[in-house]
Structures are given as C-alpha cells and as structure tokens.
Amino acid sequence: MAGRYDSNPFEEDDVNPFSEQARGKAGGQPSYGGGAFYMPNPRNVPSVSSNSRLSPLPPEPAAFGATVDIPLDSSKDLKNREKELQAREAELNKREKELKRREEAAARAGIVIEEKNWPPFLPLIHHDITNEIPSHLQRMQYVAFASFLGLACCLFWNVIAVTSAWVKGEGVKIWLLAIIYFISGVPGAYVLWYRPLYNAMRTDSALKFGLFFLVYLFHILFCVFSAVAPPVVFEGKSLAGILPAIDLISKNALVGIFYFVGFGLFCVESLLSIWVIQQVYMYFRGSGKAAEMKRDATRGAMRAAF
C-alpha cells in the first residue's frame, strides 16, 4: 500500500513550458498525451515564422477635425440688424405716444371714440349695455333693445306675408310699400328713438329722454296701426294686420295664415313697447329728470324771448 505522502505516479512535473529547457525537451521526446491530437513526428509540422503574420491595415484619419459649413453672421451684420431693430422700436414708441396724445385731446374735448361691435358677424353700430349703462338701468335697456329687434322682426315678416299676397295676384304696389317699411323702419327706429334712449341712460340726459318719449309714442301708434291695418292705403294689404288677414283667409288659406302671424307679432310688439315707455317714464319722474327738463325748457324760452 502506498504511503500517505507518496508521490502520484500520474502527476506531471512542474515544468515551465515557456523555458528554453522545456522547449528542447519537448522537441527531443515524443509526446503521447495528446489523445486525438497526437502527432507521431512533430518535426514534420511547419513552423510559423514571425514574418507570416498579417500586416495591419493602414491607419485612417479620424473625423474629429471635419469641418461643417455653418453660415454665421459677422459682427458687422449683427450690429446692422441691432440698429434696424432699435429704429423700429423707436418708431413704434413714437406712434404710441402720438396715439395717446390724440386720445387725451379727444377726451378733453368731450369726444367719445366708439368702436363698432354689433352685430358680431358684421359690426355696424356700437352697442355695449353691460359696460356703459348703469347696472340698475340695464334691465330696462335690454327690454328696449328687445323691442327694437321685435320691430325689425315684425317688418321682416310683413315683407314675407305681403310677398305671398303679391304672388297670389294682389299687385306689386303693396310689396313695394312693405319693402319701404322695412328699409326705412329699422334704421329709422335706431336713430330716432333707440339711440337717444341708449345715450340718455348712459349720460343721464333729460333732453335725450324727452326726444325718446316724443318719437317712441309714434312708434307705438305705428305698431297698433299695423296690427289692425285698416283699409287706408291700398286696401291695407301692405301691412300684415287683422283686417286684411280676415279678408285673405277666404281667398287663400296660406296667405291668410301669414297675415295672422304678422298680426300676432305686431300685437306682441305693441304690448312690449307700452311696457318700455311706462318703465322709462317712471324712472324719468322718480329721478327728478322731469323737473330738470322743465327748468331747461324755461331757460330756453327766456333766452329766446330776450
């Protein structure tokens, strides 16, 4: 039996394979430990010379120094642009100061610059109840504005009703009168009574209130007259009132219905207008504007007399 510290007969010697002695020994002795890679005569294997190595590729320059053409403005161009911007800024400041000076001069002269803002899709007039009319008068002004729009609606429907009567053989004269009512009635109402009321509410002017009352009474009379449409002008058929509606319903039901609708619209407009003038008159009396208007009228009469 082998001892505890006996050497292993299968253990290889501690030999440095890179030493010259080991190289000579390996060249002189056959090797049987190669297994499947055993070579009977290692001398027949051609040796690899140092000159058989692959030559390295030639070095290529790195792209760190590649130039990119980026157009940069010179300092002279930058200075020119800066001067141009400064000139534009100075011109804008000059225009702003001039506009401010004109606005202040207009304000001192009592001139109010009004921007057209209504209707929104095609501004024709300046109308801003929320910002220009006192809060306690806004409801009254809105109802007056509704009566103005109601008159425009009545006259427009009147054109439709009279057009249907003209198509059914009632003559072209009534249609021309209906067109005249619409073209002259809507802008006339705005200029003669709605705008004076708007300015009276905004400036609290007794004289403008008086102009409104005078013209608005004629407006109410016209609405009542249109609702009845007596046979005064062209048998009254130029207005869609109750009397021509009764006359036409027996001839043509559709035309008669159009006239009855017009009669209803004129009735609603008359009632709304009566409510407006009543409310405005109550405010006019309660605020002391009636007495102020009397004093102004007395002063005007005395000045005219002397």
Curated annotation (Swiss-Prot):
It is found in: Cell membrane; Cytoplasmic vesicle, Secretory vesicle membrane. Disulfide bonds: none annotated. The chain crosses the membrane at residues 142-162, 174-194, 209-229, 257-277. GO terms for cellular component: early endosome; plasma membrane; recycling endosome membrane; trans-Golgi network membrane; transport vesicle membrane. Residues 40-55 have a biased composition (Low complexity). It holds the Pfam family SCAMP. It is a multi-pass membrane protein. Residues 1-66 are annotated as: Disordered. It comes from the Eukaryota. One of its GO terms (biological process) is protein transport. Residues 1-141, 278-306 are cytoplasmic. Keywords: Cell membrane, Coiled coil, Cytoplasmic vesicle, Membrane, Transmembrane, Transmembrane helix, Transport. Residues 25-36 have a biased composition (Gly residues). The keyword DNA damage does not apply. PANTHER family: SECRETORY CARRIER-ASSOCIATED MEMBRANE PROTEIN 1, SECRETORY CARRIER-ASSOCIATED MEMBRANE PROTEIN SCAMP. Belongs to the SCAMP family. This is Secretory carrier-associated membrane protein 1. The lineage of its organism: Eukaryota, Viridiplantae, Streptophyta, Embryophyta, Tracheophyta.
